[in-house]
Amino acid sequence: MYIVFEGIDGAGKSTQINLLKDWLDQNGFDVETVVEPTDSEVGKLIRKILQRPDATTDRIQKTLGLLFAADRMLIMDKLNDDSKVILSDRSFISSLAYQEPAEWIEQINKYAKEPDLVLLLDVDVKTSVNRCSKEDEFENEEFLSKVKANYLDLISNFNHEIIDASTGVNKVSTDIKKAVAPYMGICPDCIR
């Protein structure tokens, strides 16, 4: 099972992935987590480029698009391991939400694995910006408003659940467990 957490920066993806991993581990599942960008050499290069002041320019965005697609290809074996539950902090869907043009992003990611379930953590842009570290050029209201709109437009193309990520860590975690439970053969009504 390949479950992807998506959402704008500051939505709480990392926190919620860890909480879901712990819960699934406790329920006897073999769980592995991945983060995009990865810790590969390509992923490290992506992280470095994201810090550049010109990271939002068209040229750098296209470069990042290619690098993210390459980084994804490096983890395909892990994503295709059906013996594990894979929880991913982002996927090619992030590239579709964050980068342009969409047709080109789709083309360079045509071999990316499609998630079995996408959990879109939805949070207000102002809340997101307040939660962010302000480490890169993308953590601003104008840009994140556009990205959020992109997510909401494209999410219907995937098997998904939209989770209100503004309700507090515990409530969000419970909502995620209830969304994931049926896929894992767990009674969602038994989750509190």
UniProtKB/Swiss-Prot annotation:
A single GO molecular function term of this UniProt record: dTMP kinase activity
Asked whether the keyword Kinase is assigned, the reply is yes
Q: What is its EC number?
A: 2.7.4.9
The answer, when asked if Nucleotide-binding is one of the entry's keywords, is yes
Binding annotation for ATP: G7, I8, D9, G10, A11, G12, K13, S14
Q: Which InterPro entries match?
A: P-loop_NTPase, Thymidylate_kin-like_dom, Thymidylate_kin_CS, Thymidylate_kinase
Under the heading Pfam families, the entry gives: Thymidylate_kin (PF02223)
Which top class of enzyme applies to this chain?
transferase
- Which keywords appear in this protein's UniProt record, sorted alphabetically? ATP-binding, Kinase, Nucleotide biosynthesis, Nucleotide-binding, Transferase
Catalysed reaction equations from the record: dTMP + ATP = dTDP + ADP
Q: What CDD domains does its record include?
A: TMPK (cd01672)
Q: Which GO terms describe its biological process?
A: dTDP biosynthetic process; dTTP biosynthetic process; dUDP biosynthetic process
List the record's Gene Ontology CC terms alphabetically.
Answer: cytoplasm
Q: Which protein family is named in the record?
A: Belongs to the thymidylate kinase family.
Q: What is this protein called?
A: Probable thymidylate kinase
Organism the protein comes from: Methanobrevibacter smithii (strain ATCC 35061 / DSM 861 / OCM 144 / PS)
Organism taxonomic ancestry: Archaea, Methanobacteriati, Methanobacteriota, Methanomada group, Methanobacteria
